[in-house]
């Protein structure tokens, strides 16, 4: 559909693309009336749009759907089974259709990232789960590129760009397993040298 979906604090609207668009004919139509946390931009993922909302001191997430055949719009909450799990005031949201995953960060604790994982079978979502990652740094931004999540991290006044592979059943090259080690880097060792390895970052004590 060539429609523009607009999100307000108290509702959702549509600007239809098949109408003649002039200053005199433009028409914005309300379609649903769900609260929206305007602290972050809604996430377009596949044929759905995800947007957070505040529930007191906690946050919820809605899955906005469009029926192209009937031009009907609806929204389903995907946090109804965990209403007191995610803190309020979401400031960033990122998602991947490759991994069926959405990540959220709240302003109340930018060291935590909440992860929504789901599985579709046809048009039916048969599995979904929420989990939480806790990091030793503050998250300032994040974005998926294919199956990798890139995170802008701040720790001890230093800003770093980190990559977190989110691919399922990921294994290391030339192995049948994956090594779970933060900040790891590849290095080629030559027999006979002093064994010094130069890291692309400055290690911290502890």
Set out the residue ranges of the language-model regions.
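Beta-sheet repeat architectures centered on beta-propellers
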Residues: 2, 55-206
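Catalytic or ion-translocation cores adjacent to nucleophile or general acid/base/metal-coordination motifs
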Residues: 19-63
